[in-house]
From Swiss-Prot:
Native organism: Bacillus cereus (strain AH187)
Site for Important for acyl-CoA specificity, residues: E111
Residues the entry annotates as binding substrate: K163, S192, R249
Protein name: Homoserine O-acetyltransferase
Compartments where found: Cytoplasm
Catalytic residues (UniProt): C142, H235, E237
Main EC class the enzyme belongs to: transferase
GO CC term, one of those recorded: cytoplasm
UniProt similarity note: Belongs to the MetA family.
Pathway of action: Amino-acid biosynthesis; L-methionine biosynthesis via de novo pathway; O-acetyl-L-homoserine from L-homoserine: step 1/1
Length: 301
């Protein structure tokens, strides 16, 4: 089934070229189907790339989704044209009286700041509070996961001596959890972080369950409130070349950045990346949508 997006959204062309089934809002209105309402709070500066990454994954399920893109009203985005935001995005104020089946909160390149130093922190707190009663399930990614764990449960983040950067092996820690349905016991996921949350802090919160972690990269998947809140510290949504682009960008800035681990063939940045996370990335998003959104949401929101 398709994802419903604006016919002029640039990501639409990318998805159609990859045979991802997309549908315009105009066509969807002619069908007698109650599509799932999914909001994506896009905190990334690379808005269009993030749109394509997430839409690619949530569009790869049998469910019909009506996608709403959100940006922060209290933050000025400098890396995306204002016309793009005006045309395709809403703010929290626009939708705060609505209910949603699912919400995705992305990462953001602000992790070296304390949460309270982030210029849109107060607005984000209001959105996270709103999600507790107006969203069936919320998926938090990377910094968004750190923010959610901190706001909802008081779980702190800690600076790392070296950036966790690359593709890492993870182990499933809880069997028979629907979010991990179909997962191998060992699976890969990308990480790109300067900070971490610690397993010991997660285990001190009785409402949280650690689902998967990595010896090298630490905590990856955590679930809370019977699936109403899902936290992914890694980036299973990343495209094949995302880590490569981050690596090359930082080198051009003159930063001392290591080659992303377990990513390039023969660990040689002149060779192509090896994608080892795509199947489990698709499983993660499809399981979230099926078991924690579709199966749990009421027909009338």
């Amino acid at each position: 089934m398709p994802i419903i997006i604006d016919k002029d959204l640039p990501a639409r062309k990318v998805l159609q070229e990859e045979n991802i089934f997309v549908m315009t809002k105009e066509r969807a209105e002619t069908q007698d189907i109650r599509a799932l309402k999914i909001a994506i709070l896009n905190l990334m500066p690379t808005k269009q790339e993030t749109e394509a990454q997430l839409l690619r994954l949530i569009g790869n399920t049998p469910l019909q989704l009506d996608v709403h893109l959100l940006h922060m009203e209290s933050h000025l985005s400098r890396n995306v044209a204002q016309e793009h935001l005006t045309s395709f995005y809403k703010t929290f104020r626009d939708i705060e009286n609505e209910k949603f089946d699912g919400l995705i909160i992305t990462g953001a390149p602000v992790e070296t700041l304390s949460f309270e130093e982030v210029d849109y922190w107060e607005e984000l707190k209001r959105i996270m509070e709103y999600s507790k009663t107006n969203v069936t399930s919320t998926l938090h990614i990377c910094w968004g996961a750190q923010a959610g764990l901190y706001h909802h449960y008081g779980v702190p983040k800690y600076p790392l001596k070296e950036k966790i950067f690359g593709v890492f092996e993870h182990e499933v820690r809880e069997q028979h959890v629907k979010l991990l349905q179909g997962f191998d016991e060992l699976f890969f996921a990308p990480h790109s972080r300067h900070t971490e949350v610690r397993e010991s802090d997660i285990r001190e919160v009785k409402e949280l369950t650690l689902l998967a972690n990595s010896e090298e990269a630490g905590v990856h998947l955590v679930i809370g409130q019977e699936g109403r809140q899902v936290f992914a510290l890694g980036h299973s949504e990343y495209s094949c070349d995302t880590l490569k682009q981050e690596y090359e960008r930082d080198r051009q800035k003159g930063l001392n950045i290591d080659v992303p681990k377990n990513y390039f063939k023969h660990n040689n940045p002149n060779e192509k990346p090896l994608v080892r996370w795509r199947s489990h990335g698709n499983l993660l998003f499809s399981n979230w949508l099926n078991y924690y959104v579709y199966q749990e949401t009421p027909y009338v929101l």
